[in-house]
Amino acid sequence: MHLSTLPNVPWPNRSFTTKRPPLPNMSFSW
């Protein structure tokens, strides 16, 4: 997920973002 590298962006991949807050998304986006 390359777009997940962006800072707090409402990408359509919120399916996995729901597990953790949209703040440290880059932490587990990899």
From Swiss-Prot:
Residues 1-30 are annotated as: Disordered. This is Putative uncharacterized protein YLL019W-A. It comes from the Eukaryota. Completely overlaps KNS1.
